């Protein structure tokens, strides 16, 4: 979302006077006279009634009024501005309809970008900004990822508690429209806990697991097991279910669902989607150890009919998690490569061996090229001697 700088030609006193008159004319309980206590008191009074303009008026006109209020707010010293900014942010969350919600969103974005980047008030503005963006269905206009979020607060990082609160909000506003982004937010949230306070993050850890399992685009689930809050769930059903998605095959999930059907459903997880994901994860695991698989093997392992094998493999190839070739004539699947479901010591050793083999092959090629080059030089020299 773009935001233009705030520039108002009138002096502060003139702006305050005009705003007071404007809101009084709309019927607000406010004096048209400037306060003798200073501009901060004027702002408190103006912000207290500013939502009266939501009842009437065009969005463009209201945007101009809010812009004027913002232009005054950004002049208030930091030590006296917190209550004013918080009061304004709260008012902006009360827009009665979508067009005005977008006006309030733009106003908060303008305030956020015109505050000093080292101001701790930017956190509070951004938190309310996300709330309003959700109301307007424009969350991705203000939040595109964790890296972008961190860069915005680089000059004044919020406290761990503040970031936890913000991550929870971001998870809530993205979980219905972007599960992948929501899952990344929850993983980041769990990363803010330490060994000392991980035990109190039980609810966050459960939400993180459920979000990751429900996300159709998240397949590498092994890193979740290393998060401290997730470790505290060992022995719980949700941790058992995560472990199945990390390293077990489809039959293990089917058995778990038969034993704990109510639990799975109570977490908001869809059984058919779980089956689809577990089939893909099972296929990946089979591909790790079997460069060639028959359709018969896949029907047994994936619990599908033989005529469903080809469509299933095609769907797997679309994810780019596995590279393979279908051999319809011989009812086989030839695996070229696959992403590992887990990446532990064995996978690191395999990668080391592969890189070592590449290094040796490159050395052999280099030696061969050197020999060919030397031979060509010798041949050229001998031809010169003959002539």
UniProtKB/Swiss-Prot annotation:
Keywords: Cytoplasm, Golgi apparatus, Initiation factor, Protein biosynthesis. GO terms for molecular function: caspase binding; cysteine-type endopeptidase activator activity; translation initiation factor activity. GO terms for cellular component: cytosol; eukaryotic 43S preinitiation complex; eukaryotic 48S preinitiation complex; eukaryotic translation initiation factor 3 complex, eIF3m; Golgi apparatus; investment cone. Residues 181-340 form the PCI domain. One of its GO terms (biological process) is Golgi organization. It is found in: Cytoplasm; Golgi apparatus. SUPFAM superfamilies: Winged helix' DNA-binding domain. Belongs to the eIF-3 subunit M family. HAMAP family: eIF3m. Component of the eukaryotic translation initiation factor 3 (eIF-3) complex. The eIF-3 complex interacts with pix. PANTHER family: COP9 SIGNALOSOME COMPLEX SUBUNIT 7/DENDRITIC CELL PROTEIN GA17, EUKARYOTIC TRANSLATION INITIATION FACTOR 3 SUBUNIT M. Component of the eukaryotic translation initiation factor 3 (eIF-3) complex, which is involved in protein synthesis of a specialized repertoire of mRNAs and, together with other initiation factors, stimulates binding of mRNA and methionyl-tRNAi to the 40S ribosome. The eIF-3 complex specifically targets and initiates translation of a subset of mRNAs involved in cell proliferation. This is Eukaryotic translation initiation factor 3 subunit M.
